[in-house]
Every structure is written in structure tokens, then in C-alpha cells.
Amino acid sequence: MKKRLLSLLALAAVTVTAFTACGGNGAKTNSGSAAKSNTSGAASSTKSTSTVASSAKSTTTEPVTVEFWTISLKANFEEFFNKLIADYQTANPNVTINWVDVPYDDVQSKLVTAVAGGTSPDVVNLNTQMALTLVGQDALVDLNKAATDEQKSIYIESLWNSAKVGDSVYAFPWYASPDIMFYNQELMKKGGIEAPATFDQALEKAEKFHNDTKAYLFLPDEFFNLLIEENIPILNEDRTKAAFNTQAAVDLLKKYKSYTDKGVLPKTNWGSWDEALKLFESGKLAIVSSSGSSLGRIKDEAPDIYKTIAVSTPLTGSTGLSRNPLMNLVVPKASKNQEAAIAFANYITDDANQLAFCKTVSIFPSTKKASEDSFFTSDTKTLEGQASAMSAKASLTSQDFSLGVANQGTIQAAINKAYEASIINGDDIAAALKQAEEDVNKILAENK
């Protein structure tokens, strides 16, 4: 089992690239750092944490050390988290928090080493896909059973259910990064179009726009996401078999291939946040769908492009739903301090502390009360404020694209291979989908 766990972790760690921390679709540069902190709001956020620490009491009375892993947050948020931890330790003098911030490039090796060596941390920051991979190996605590009703009640239901398998839930949702649209107003004007609202509208305008501007209108989403956005079921109702190998999926790939073959849309790097940002910053792409935190990178790397940006809701398919990548806190079964770990993870993700974190960086909370705070819609004078308000709006019709099955990362990778085979390599579309179907069914069978 351990050998299989390590191999799956290695694959799942690749998927972390797409969702690590709060940065969009495939980010390495920005996604591991929760972007840069906003100088405004930092002081108020730190202050707010001290008022809630006393309510986050652990029931543990014996001295205990909780090891808490985050992914590349210390560089920009060390003061914030040190204050959170200090307040918690003051309220719980028997609990010591050992914060370990794992560098982005070391996520895979450190996690694999910890699992193999029996030195698992107590609370770990993971995206939903990687969490579900660990669920497939029976490696995480079922928080639906282990957490109290009070602890569970604070979260937005759809986000609480992101790491749900059957009746079990394996993660406390932490912060989300709802996709919004950034678009280059000058390119739109040059192309003689207004920002499209849907993928179909974008496709209708893509060829003329490319001919008029020599830029791409948009970079297609990764194939797995496109299926969900276009209401093509990934799995059957009981989630035991693949269901995506349909004529609708064939037609979807054929439609996009007709544009990539003409060079109207990019053929490679579908769904890559980093590639999209590079093209956008160089004036070769008009639309980027990403979280509000991406503005910091664009402003630093391409200030002239930053000045052209307007925001809108993201492109959507027939479902009208957009992506809302979620970061979570999980408690490994290997933790020797599960009760204390659950209490601390719930504290980090409670209303006050999530709202405080959101005031330092452009992310969105997973708790009901925090998400309704006027902070997210009160400032629309700045581009960052407009992005925050748009994130709040987009979050109402967004979701973490979770299948609710173990080993989602491997399933996602298998499905995306159909795009690589057919669009990039030019293989037969039907054959590529058939192979992906067989691969997914094999993964699902191994989950049983």
C-alpha cells in the first residue's frame, strides 16, 4: 500500500501545480505564494485574530505539539501567521504549534518523504484534488465524524462538500480563488468586439479577432474543466464508471480543433495559468480567467498591460458555472494529535481568521459569515477593488470542480491526455476518448 501511495502522491503533486495556494489554473510563479499581500488591511486583519483566539479552545489538556504545514506562505505572510499561532497558543497554553512552510518546489518530495518515513504532519494545507488522492489511500481523518457540529457549521455547504466522498468529508475548506475575467480593453477595441460572456460567444469571435489583432482572444480551459463547464458528465451517477466518452465530447474536441488547426486559438498549454499570464502580459492574449490575486503579478511584470485591464465575470459554458479552486486543511490519520489538530485547523479556517487573511490578499473565504462581509464589495474605485467585487459575484455561480471520488488527480490527468493526443498530437478524437475512458475506469476499479 505504501508503495502505491507514494506513486499516487507523486502524480498528485503534479496536479498541485494547477491549484496550489491562490493562483489560478496552472501557476508556478504566483500560485504557491497566495500572491503578494495587500498593504491595506494587514493591520486590521492581525488585530481581528486576537479577538477570537479565546473561543478556539482545544479540549486537549496534556502538552501537545501540532505540526502545521502550509505551501509557500511564509515569504509574504510570516507576520500574519505568527500572530495567529501566538494567539492560539496563548488561549491554549498546553498546545505548541510547529509551523512548517514547505517551498513550492519541494511539495512533492517533502510530502512523499513524510509519508514514507512515518513522520506525517498533523495539519496540512492541500488542494482538493490532492486531498482526494490521499482519501483513496485511507490516509485522512473523516472530519464529518471527527469534528463537532459547531466546527462543521461555519462553512459554505458547496465548499464543505468539495472533499466529500459518500457520507464522509475529509477537509476543512480554507480559502478559495474564484475565477474572474481580466481583459485587455485596447485589444478588444482593436478587434472591434466587446468582452464575450460565454465560450460559445468567444469562439464565434475568435477568428475575426485573431485576424484583426494577431492576438488570441482566449486560451481554452483544460479539457477536464471544459467537460464540466459544458455539462458533459465525467462519471456515471454512482461514480463507478466513466461517462464522458460521448458524441458530445467528440463534438466538443472537434469544435475546438477546428480553431487550433487554423491557428486562431493556441494548440498547447490549455488551462495553464502561467502560460496565459505570459501571453496576456506580452499583449498576445486578450482574456485571462484567473483569481484576483493575479493582478499583483501583472502589475509588477507588465505595468503597461495592467493599465489596459477591465474585469468581468469569467467565460462559462452551458452550465453557467465557473471554477473556484479551493485550498483546504486536512488532518492525516497518521497524526498522533488528531483532536488538537482538528481544533487548530478549525481555528485557522474560522470566520474571523479567514476574513483577516482575505484582507491581506485577493482571495475569498469558505465560511458563510465571512463571505457576506461588506469588505468584498465596498471598494470599486480601484482595479483591485473591482476584482474583489467581481470575485464575490462570480463565487455565487462557481464551484470547486470536485468529482467526490478518491484519486481525482489521476482521473483528471487521464482525461486531459485525450486533449493532448487529439489536439496536440493529431490522433483520432474518438480513439483518444476511448483510451481515456479505459484509463479512468481502471482508476475507479482500483478505488474500490
Model-derived regions, located:
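Conserved C-terminal helix/tail region of periplasmic/extracytoplasmic solute-binding proteins
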Residues: 36, 47, 189, 396-448
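Periplasmic solute-binding protein
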Residues: 134-139, 158-194, 219-239, 253, ...
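Glycine-centered hinge/linker elements that transmit conformational signals in sensory
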Residues: 206-210, 241-269
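Extracytoplasmic/periplasmic substrate-recognition and gating elements
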Residues: 86, 90-91, 254, 258-265, ...
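Long, aromatic- and glycine/proline-rich binding clefts that accommodate carbohydrate-like moieties
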Residues: 312, 360-413, 421, 447
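Bacterial lipoprotein signal-peptidase II cleavage site
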Residues: 19-42
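Hinge/lid segment of periplasmic solute-binding proteins
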Residues: 103, 127-180, 203, 209-211, ...
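Extracytoplasmic "Venus flytrap"/periplasmic binding protein-like
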Residues: 87-155, 162, 186, 190-197, ...
